[in-house]
Every structure is written in structure tokens, then in C-alpha cells.
């Protein structure tokens, strides 16, 4: 079984569409001794007036980091579709993690320092510092939700696959954060966990919040979003929850095109309404999404000729040969399999192993395994890329 830490590292490096490097600024927001805290800034191409700011905090289970380096700042997957079209500045924030021998409180200090640095330098980036928002995915949602309560000018909050109340936590439903992660990251007491929970620290007039969650989330149970939204609404704020069937901790990954498209449209509408952005048609964004995501959908009719060859994932090779035969190579072990086509996919049958089901994306160069067993990986996809030289 895959470990919680390995799954979080996989999620933290999940599929994000590429954006133009010319519009992205990578710099250092603050330093702690010899440890630099980076910041990634994406400036919209067509903004004329001052632009609102969206601060994004990555997930990854608070894993990563060394004595000399923190995990990098990243941008959310919707940046390609919304930054230029809506004229929003996206700012990716970094913070010390468990590998830096840091705590949750240290991470909040890092993030506040970076946010304050950007706001103080807002004129350099043509930023409207009166219109800001925060967002995060997975472990980043816990941090970003707390930050959103600290800044009165924060108008919106966006959380995906989130954990917002560390006191209401059943490890059987939500393995993150487990007792070991809490101990390492300075959340071992009830008081510290409460301080790290936006649920217990709502500000007066909380920001308008959008919470995205899969109903099959095996790391952070979807009731975290439902309960947090209720808390916000009961406090006089405004919160919306969007739940997805058969989705497991992947609400903002283009590898799940239908869910990704709906999530981006929800975010776009939130930006338009709460940042008061005018003269933008949501249909333009929908068309861009349809065009960009077309090749991410599965190919309906797969033929043997499209599958023959070598397919590689991070640590496994799969070779399809003619006449329904093939080989899988994992950790220097080679096993022969039979394969057949059914239900729009390819089923691999290996002796004394569970059957595996693969689908080919329309681009013809990436196939993915869909996990259907009742495990932490249920409904997740693992990509394999075709080797062009075989």
C-alpha cells in the first residue's frame, strides 16, 4: 500500500498546465539566516488598471525541505486560464516544511512575511492591494484559510481538498494530518491545533469562500468543507461548497478535465463577482478550457496499434506487444501479462495479481491507470507516457 507521505508528494507534484515563463517572476521575499523563502509572481498580460492579487499556497502534506532549501513556490492550475483573461496577479507562496525542522507556526510566519513583502511592493507590480484573495490545496488549504482570516482586505478564499478544523479529526476518515505529522509540525496539543484551524478563528466579516472537495477524498474528508462552510454562513459570511462524485483529492488537476473545468469556472465567477471585474464573458473562458483540455479526455476507441510500445511512469515500465501479450517491469522484476480491450480501456491480467485497467488520452501519448480498489488511491489516475524511440 502506498504511504501517506508518498501520496502527498505525488499530489504536491500533480499535473499543472504550463504557462509562459516570460510573465513569471521568481524572486526571494525574505531570508532566515541562509534559508531563502522564494515567491513566484505571474503578471497578467493585458491588465491596464491595477490588478487584484490572488495568493496561492501549495500542498504536499507539509513534507519536503532541507537544511538549505524550502519546497518551491508554485502557482495553481487555473492560472493559465484566468490570470490573463481576468487581469489577476497570481502569487505563489513558499514556506518551511517538516524537512526544514519547522512548525506550522513557522510556516505562518514565512507566509505572512512574503505576503507583506508583496503588498509593500505592490506598486512595482501594478497591484491593487485593496483587492486580495487567498487559496490553497490540501495541506496548503489549512495554512491559507488561517491567513485569509488575518487580512481584513482579503475579499475571497478558495480551498480545494481542504482541512480546516484540526480538532474535529478522525484519522480513519482523514489520515491527514496523522499523529506523527502533528508531532513533527508542532501541532501535538489541542491549543496548537485550534490556533491552526480557520474553523475556530474566523474573523468578523469572513471572506467570501469557495470550497471544492471530492466525495471520495481519502486524505481530507469532504465533511471538512461542509462544516467550514456552515460555520462561515452561520457567522454571517458567504460560503459555497462544490462536491464531486468519484473524485479523490484532485479538484484542481487538469488530469481530471471535467472536474478541473467546473472548478476553474467556479473560481472565475468568484473573481468576477468579488473582485468587481467588468466586461468579461465567462463563455470566453469556457471555450479556452474546452480547447486546452480536449486531449486530456480518454479516447473512446483504442486499437492495438495505438498501444504497442513502451510506456513509462515514474518507477514502472509497461510494454504492450502484438497478439495480446506484454511485460511489466517494476524494481527490476519482470512479469508477463495478457491484455484485452473492454469498456473503452485496456485490461491487463497478470498471474496472481489484481487486474489493472488503463485508458488512453486523446493525445495518444499518455495513458493512465485508474485505481478502482478500496484504498487511499481509489479513483486516482497514474500517468504513463509513451516512449517515442521504441
Residue ranges and their predicted role:
Residues 68-91:
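Short amphipathic alpha-helix adjacent to the substrate-entry channel of hydrolases
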Residues 162-201:
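Mobile cap/lid helix-loop segments that gate and shape the active-site cleft of serine hydrolases
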Residues 50-61:
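Short beta-strand element of the alpha/beta-hydrolase
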Residues 205, 210-213, 217:
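Short beta-strand/loop motif that positions the catalytic acidic residue
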Residues 226, 233-295:
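C-terminal catalytic histidine-bearing segment of alpha/beta-hydrolase fold enzymes
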Residues 279-336, 342-390:
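Lipid interaction determinants
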Residues 22-48:
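N-terminal cap/lid segment of alpha/beta-hydrolase-fold proteins
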Residues 113-173:
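Primarily recognizes the serine-hydrolase "nucleophile elbow" in alpha/beta-hydrolase
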Amino acid at each position: 500500500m502506498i504511504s501517506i507521505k508518498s501520496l502527498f508528494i505525488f499530489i504536491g507534484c500533480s499535473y499543472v498546465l504550463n504557462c509562459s515563463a516570460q510573465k513569471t517572476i521568481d524572486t526571494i521575499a525574505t531570508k532566515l539566516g541562509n534559508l531563502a523563502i522564494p515567491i513566484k509572481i505571474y503578471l497578467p498580460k493585458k491588465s491596464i488598471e491595477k490588478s487584484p492579487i490572488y495568493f496561492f499556497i501549495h500542498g504536499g502534506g507539509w513534507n519536503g525541505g532541507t537544511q538549505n532549501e524550502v519546497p518551491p513556490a508554485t502557482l495553481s492550475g487555473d492560472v493559465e486560464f484566468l490570470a490573463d483573461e481576468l487581469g489577476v496577479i497570481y502569487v505563489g507562496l513558499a514556506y518551511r516544511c517538516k524537512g526544514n525542522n519547522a512548525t506550522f507556526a513557522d510556516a505562518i510566519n514565512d507566509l505572512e512575511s512574503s505576503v507583506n513583502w508583496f503588498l509593500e511592493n505592490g506598486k512595482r507590480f501594478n497591484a491593487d492591494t485593496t483587492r486580495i484573495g487567498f487559496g490553497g490545496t490540501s495541506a496548503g488549504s489549512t495554512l491559507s484559510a488561517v491567513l485569509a482570516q488575518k487580512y481584513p482586505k482579503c475579499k475571497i478564499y478558495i480551498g480545494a481538498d481542504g482541512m480546516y478544523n484540526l480538532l474535529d479529526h478522525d484519522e480513519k476518515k482523514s489520515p491527514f494530518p496523522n499523529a506523527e505529522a502533528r508531532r513533527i509540525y508542532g501541532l501535538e496539543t489541542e491549543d496548537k491545533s485550534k490556533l491552526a484551524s480557520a474553523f475556530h478563528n474566523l474573523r468578523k466579516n469572513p471572506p467570501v469562500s469557495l470550497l471544492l472537495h471530492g466525495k471520495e477524498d481519502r486524505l481530507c474528508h469532504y465533511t471538512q468543507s461542509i462544516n467550514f462552510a456552515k460555520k462561515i454562513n452561520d457567522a454571517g459570511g458567504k460560503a459555497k461548497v462544490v462536491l464531486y462524485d468519484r473524485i479523490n483529492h484532485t479538484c484542481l488537476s487538469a488530469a481530471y478535465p471535467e472536474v478541473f473545468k467546473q472548478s476553474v469556472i467556479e473560481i472565475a465567477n468568484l473573481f468576477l463577482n468579488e473582485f468587481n471585474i467588468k466586461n468579461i464573458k465567462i463563455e470566453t473562458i469556457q471555450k479556452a478550457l474546452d480547447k486546452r483540455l480536449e486531449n486530456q479526455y480518454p479516447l473512446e476507441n483504442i486499437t492495438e496499434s495505438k498501444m504497442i510500445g513502451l510506456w513509462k511512469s515514474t518507477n514502472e515500465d509497461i510494454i504492450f506487444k502484438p497478439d495480446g501479450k506484454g511485460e511489466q517491469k517494476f524494481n527490476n522484476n519482470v512479469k508477463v501479462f495478457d491484455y484485452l480491450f473492454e469498456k473503452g480501456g485496456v485490461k491487463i491480467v497478470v498471474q496472481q495479481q489484481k487486474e489493472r485497467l488503463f485508458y488512453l488520452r486523446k493525445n495518444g501519448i499518455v495513458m493512465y491507470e485508474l485505481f478502482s480498489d478500496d484504498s487511499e488511491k481509489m479513483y486516482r489516475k497514474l500517468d504513463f507516457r509513451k516512449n517515442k524511440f521504441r
